[in-house]
Structures are given as C-alpha cells and as structure tokens.
Amino acid sequence: MATRLDGRAVSKKILADLKQTIAQLAQHDVTPTLAVVLVGSNPASEVYVRNKQRRAEDIGVRSLMFRMPEATTQADLLAKVAELNHDPDIDAILVQLPLPAGLDEQAVIDAIDPDKDVDGFSPVSVGRLWANEPTVVASTPYGIMALLDAYDIDVAGKRVVIIGRSNIVGRPLAGLMVNHDATVTIAHSKTRDLKQLAKEADILVVAVGVPHFIGADAVKPGAVVIDVGISRGADGKVLGDVDEAAVAPIASAITPVPGGVGPMTIASLMAQTVTLAKRRANG
C-alpha cells in the first residue's frame, strides 16, 4: 500500500520554520511584505486570498490586500502594479488570477517587477527557471518539489511524466524536475497513448482537473503519484484527478486529495515571500 504524502503535516513544519526565520528578520527591522491585488469578486479567488492572508498573519508576513472593482480598466490595473513595483517596502506582488473578462492577464504579469514576482509567472522568472538560475517559481510546483524532498524522494535519474501543460503547474514543474536531473515528458490532451505513457513513469504528476482521470491501469507498480487536481463530484465530495482507492495498492507513494498538494501551495508562497524579503535585506 502506498505511503500517503501528507502535505498538511509538511506544510505545517515549513510554516513553523518560516515563523522562526521571520522572527530573526524582525531583529534586523525586516518584515516580509506581500501585496495581493484582487480584481472583482470571484468566489474561489476570495477563498484562496483569505487563506493566504490567514497563513501570512500566523507566521508574521505582512499581507496587504488591494481590492479593485470588477470594472477596473487595464490602465488602472497596470498603474496599481507600477505603484507596487516602486514601493520599497513591498517584497512580493501577487495579482490573483483569473482576472475579469476584458483584462489582459499576460500584460499584467509582464508588468510585475521580476524581483517581486512571487508567482514566478513573468517571462524573466520563467527564463531564469529554464536557465537553471536562482529564481522564484510558481507555488504549486515549488510545493510539489518540497513535498517530495520531505519524504526523501529523489527525482534524479527518474522518468517523470507530467499530465498537464499549464503555466501554473505543468511547465514550471517540468523545469524544476529537469533542473534536478529528472528525465521529463509533458503530456496533454493531444498526446497519443497517454495511459501507456503514464504507465512508464517512475513519478507521475496529474494536473488536468478531471475527476479520477487516472486509474490503476495507467500506473506502474511502485510509481510515485502526485495528484494536483481538485474537483467536486455530483454529491459534493472533493475528488482528485487520480482514483486513490484504485491506485494506492499499486503505487509506492501518493498524495491524497484533499491534504496533499493543496496545503503545500500556500506554504510555498510564504516561503518565497520570505526569500524575496531576504534579498531586499541583503541589498
């Protein structure tokens, strides 16, 4: 039976360690500061932002919320980003996505100072990642790598298959895996023989948003399975992209949903906010 990779427990330890680091920074008059820009009133975004703020307060990160109305123009949003870019007391900027219709998300991402881009979405951050240079990266991939590390799962030399090619998970995770000496394949909706490909993976990452997309017939015995998906079934039950009950007897390790990758994402956001604050403190 597979080991369950407990993201709640690992994230709790990460946050506790960060709290100590932040207390040490406070002795040098440095308070890690995260600016969150929320445009409109997307319910899912509201929940996620509240969770971020709660975690920030728990560990001593200063979290500033900038709410902008649904009718915000592109020019007004870019002006707010520019203002935050030039504020010397702000270490990290996060514009909560998705933005309301009519706003150009990529233009907003491009406008964020790469040295404050805590999501790692800017072209400069992406370039640094693929050049294997120090940079912040998207929080979910960062959290996945931290979770694997916490369980001493070494990716070097492993065959990794990532199902999903989003800029939020699949692509940046591929970069991190390559930088840690894994052999990586990204699969997607146009990939032929996808389940056969998945079955060749030593480490299988699934991020497609389709409940129980992967079952026992697509997993190699002994594989590590990372389930990034989270959906709700007709009965309201939270479901992952992987059928855990079917796959757990085959895999060597698996992330539960909920309680696997999800908690690691916010912990990773906090960790990278602290990293950016340290950079500011060191000049």
UniProtKB/Swiss-Prot annotation:
GO biological process: L-histidine biosynthetic process; methionine biosynthetic process; purine nucleotide biosynthetic process; tetrahydrofolate interconversion
Catalytic activity: (6R)-5,10-methylene-5,6,7,8-tetrahydrofolate + NADP(+) = (6R)-5,10-methenyltetrahydrofolate + NADPH; (6R)-5,10-methenyltetrahydrofolate + H2O = (6R)-10-formyltetrahydrofolate + H(+)
GO cellular component, one term: cytosol
Subunit structure, as described in the record: Homodimer.
Alphabetical list of InterPro entries matching this protein: Aminoacid_DH-like_N_sf (IPR046346), NAD(P)-bd_dom_sf (IPR036291), THF_DH/CycHdrlase (IPR000672), THF_DH/CycHdrlase_cat_dom (IPR020630), THF_DH/CycHdrlase_CS (IPR020867), THF_DH/CycHdrlase_NAD-bd_dom (IPR020631)
Gene3D superfamilies (alphabetical): Leucine Dehydrogenase, chain A, domain 1, NAD(P)-binding Rossmann-like Domain
Family assignment from sequence similarity: Belongs to the tetrahydrofolate dehydrogenase/cyclohydrolase family.
HAMAP family in the cross-refs: THF_DHG_CYH
Regions that span the bilayer: none
Residues that, per the record, bind NADP(+): G164, R165, S166, S189, I230
Protein name as annotated: Bifunctional protein FolD
EC number, UniProt record: 1.5.1.5, 3.5.4.9
Role: Catalyzes the oxidation of 5,10-methylenetetrahydrofolate to 5,10-methenyltetrahydrofolate and then the hydrolysis of 5,10-methenyltetrahydrofolate to 10-formyltetrahydrofolate.
Keywords recorded for this protein, A-Z: Amino-acid biosynthesis, Histidine biosynthesis, Hydrolase, Methionine biosynthesis, Multifunctional enzyme, NADP, One-carbon metabolism, Oxidoreductase, Purine biosynthesis
Source species, domain of life: Bacteria
Associated pathway: One-carbon metabolism; tetrahydrofolate interconversion
Molecular function, one GO term: methylenetetrahydrofolate dehydrogenase (NADP+) activity
